[in-house]
Amino acid sequence: MAIERTFSIIKPDAVAKNHIGAIYNRFETAGLKIVAAKMLHLTKEQAEGFYAEHSERGFFGALVAFMTSGPIMVQVLEGENAVLAHREILGATNPAQAAPGTIRADFAQSIDENAAHGSDSLESAAREIAYFFSAEELCPRTR
């Protein structure tokens, strides 16, 4: 098993409903360690930059508006097969299709406001981590 890092966002809908602690508990219970975290309110420019790969898709404007509608939590998670483990904890993108007990099944209302984001590959994780965190902000958890 490989120790990996992945990137995660707790989106404005889940932050507004005070689900941060419950979601962090899910990460830690699954063996993922939080090695960096911060709360921020994305600017339009930050959201457009982060989601640039979707800029030509019809939902881009609504996505940017949602992601700038309130504070978010961004975090870096570390653990065995972290990318896959995190995505399994999140559940399907559409909460109506997410397995019971997953973050999206338990905390999301719709496919548009689905509580959380997780990197889909190691390459995406590296890019997304670097978008929000400097190397100095990552704190390896060795104890």
From Swiss-Prot:
It is found in: Cytoplasm. The active site is at residue 117. One of its GO terms (biological process) is UTP biosynthetic process. Keywords: ATP-binding, Cytoplasm, Kinase, Magnesium, Metal-binding, Nucleotide metabolism, Nucleotide-binding, Phosphoprotein, Transferase. GO terms for molecular function: ATP binding; metal ion binding; nucleoside diphosphate kinase activity. Gene3D superfamilies: Nucleoside diphosphate kinase-like domain. CDD domains: NDPk_I (cd04413). It is an enzyme of class 2 (transferase). It holds the Pfam family NDK. ATP binds at residues 11, 59, 87, 93, 104, 114. Homotetramer. Major role in the synthesis of nucleoside triphosphates other than ATP. The ATP gamma phosphate is transferred to the NDP beta phosphate via a ping-pong mechanism, using a phosphorylated active-site intermediate. Belongs to the NDK family. This is Nucleoside diphosphate kinase. It comes from Shewanella sp. (strain MR-4). The gene is ndk.
